[in-house]
Amino acid sequence: MLGSVTDFLKPRLVDIEQLSPTHAKVTLEPLERGFGHTLGNALRRILLSSMPGCAVAEVEIDGVLHEYSSKEGVQEDILEILLNLKGIAVKLEGKDEVILSLTKSGAGPVTAGDIIHGDDVVIVNPEHVICHLTGANAEISMRLRVQRGRGYVPASARLHTDDEDRPIGRLLLDAAFSPVVRIAYNVEAARVEQRTDLDKLVIDMETNGTLDPEEAIRRAATILAEQLDAFVDLRDVSVPEKKEDKPEFDPILLRPVDDLELTVRSANCLKAEAIHYIGDLVQRTEVELLKTPNLGKKSLTEIKDVLASRGLSLGMRLENWPPASLADN
């Protein structure tokens, strides 16, 4: 009797209904009451957010400087073209990033099949329309950066400080790396012998064709199992506290006096007294500075005000100044 109360039913994969190459229904039963929603919601979230895939992440279109423009001879504006580029289903074999090119002229549609690529790239939906050329002399040329990633990554999340040097005309796209286009689940009633309070989980999902739906669910289940492994054997694992290396001096003290943007007269007076760094300056007193040739009360007031705006003052004591990095210089 005790075993029947504490033992959980183990679900089995009942059916995989392949509705199309990109659309499938997977049925799993029997599940203990409530486990249909528990597992269904977990798998749904993983399938939407954690499936790896490839997507167009950046594009450079000849004659286009920014996304809020249009191109002569092209029916769509640039924003619509960028939106269409996000719909290209692409797979990379053995690479994490490639640069592809597309050049098309003459009236008619421009499709994903017009993209020039090697054997290590597969365009799953070559019929996907990118834009339309409206005249015999119309032409469009672009370079596409395809990257491997996971989930959905907006363009703003991929901006870095070093992107200030990015050439004008390179447009970042919101990258939808996940191959899962749609995922829904339904929990139905199931029965085993006399028990009628069980769950049946039906997962209905579509992909963009770069990943088989059955394989997608298998990967999602593997990810979920790996994440739960840590809970199987809970132990008191103490994580050593990481000691942060605090700088010996405030970084502002290591900056040159020129960064204070003093007047030329004041700056020259300080340099004449070998005061090259802000740390050198804050250790001087008002009396010492007034003894500096050509440095009067007006210059002293200027220096005090500039230091105060940065939370500093004259007459500060700095132990072990100057640091070795400045002494070597």
Curated annotation (Swiss-Prot):
InterPro entries: DNA-dir_RNA_pol_insert, DNA-dir_RNA_pol_RpoA/D/Rpb3, DNA-dir_RpoA, RBP11-like, RNAP_asu_C, RNApol_insert_sf. Pfam families: RNA_pol_A_bac (PF01000), RNA_pol_A_CTD (PF03118), RNA_pol_L (PF01193). It comes from the Bacteria. GO terms for molecular function: DNA binding; DNA-directed RNA polymerase activity; protein dimerization activity. DNA-dependent RNA polymerase catalyzes the transcription of DNA into RNA using the four ribonucleoside triphosphates as substrates. Homodimer. The RNAP catalytic core consists of 2 alpha, 1 beta, 1 beta' and 1 omega subunit. When a sigma factor is associated with the core the holoenzyme is formed, which can initiate transcription. This is DNA-directed RNA polymerase subunit alpha.
